[in-house]
């Protein structure tokens, strides 16, 4: 059975500069980790490969501002003030897994964590949906997913996805049984 670590490695190995938006591609440095700027597309690819909503996964985004090498600014008022002085508006995306049948209540799955030289402050994130209103992978995420399928195999990924979904559904049933009133 595949692990998150194996899927993460395959996603990272599938990231290429043409998948970046022009804004991020222009800001890349040759010594940046390959993950830099790919957080949304990498998180989206993992979300769908792992079973998405049916498996209890939840996208999370965190907005912040930064000015050069300065610290990240999360407070909304401070962000607005910093942005008027030239600070860049940024976001970071990751996925939260399920816990005890609760969607998005568990572990953090951050495919692109290595783009930060410190532990990202995940407590500043908020649950969200992806930017695709059709509830399907974006074109860029689909490119990454297709590359991951080639690396790891469709059957292996399907087994991982089905296990995630089955485990989440089992936990939900167990949760419902414990919440039923006793007669």
Regions picked out by a protein language model, each given a short descriptive name:
Residues 1-182:
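A structural boundary/capping signal
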């Amino acid at each position: 059975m595949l692990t998150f670590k194996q899927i993460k490695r395959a996603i990272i190995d599938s990231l290429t500069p043409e998948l970046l938006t022009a804004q991020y591609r222009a800001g890349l440095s040759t010594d940046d980790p390959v993950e830099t700027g790919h957080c949304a597309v990498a998180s989206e690819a993992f979300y769908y490969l792992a079973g998405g909503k049916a498996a209890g996964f939840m996208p999370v985004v965190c907005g912040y501002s930064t000015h050069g090498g300065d610290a990240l600014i999360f407070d909304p008022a401070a962000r607005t003030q910093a942005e008027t002085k030239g600070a860049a508006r940024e976001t970071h995306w990751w996925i939260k897994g399920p816990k005890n049948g609760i969607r998005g209540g568990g572990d953090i799955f951050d495919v692109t964590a290595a783009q930060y030289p410190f532990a990202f402050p995940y407590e500043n994130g908020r649950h969200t949906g992806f930017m695709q209103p059709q509830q399907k992978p974006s074109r860029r995420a689909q490119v990454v997913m297709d590359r991951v399928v080639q690396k790891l195999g469709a059957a292996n990924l399907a087994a991982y996805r089905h296990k995630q979904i089955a485990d989440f559904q089992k936990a939900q049933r167990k949760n419902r049984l414990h919440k039923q009133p006793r007669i």
